Amino acid sequence: MHKEQLMKLHQFFVYVVKEIMDDNLENTDNECKKLFKIYEMLDIRPHHIHRLKSEQKAAILLLSACVASYLANNMDNVPKNLAKKLEENAFKHLNSCKKNIIILEENENNGESAEKEE
């Protein structure tokens, strides 16, 4: 995909995620909120033309993982592992461009959020 096409796709996913978050904030699951926080921490926006293609791809994959997570929780025919695979691919793209990010993870022991440097 060309960079301009990636930027348009990125903008599309931004609109979709904001629509989901605005209309259904109480129905939006924690996984989607966590992915959107990570996306915001990346500070990669559709209009940032100076960013690498791999960074744009990672942002798109994070947003699409958020959408997939929302759909999996609200529809029966969307597999729940789709969001996880998209999230894994996003981090793979970030690691390929040597981008260090902070990931908010749910601590399995007591439900508190913990910060981890990846």
Curated annotation (Swiss-Prot):
Family (UniProt): Belongs to the UPF0058 family.
PANTHER family reported for this sequence: UPF0058 PROTEIN MJ1205
Protein name, UniProt field: UPF0058 protein MJ1132
Species of the source: Methanocaldococcus jannaschii (strain ATCC 43067 / DSM 2661 / JAL-1 / JCM 10045 / NBRC 100440) (Methanococcus jannaschii)
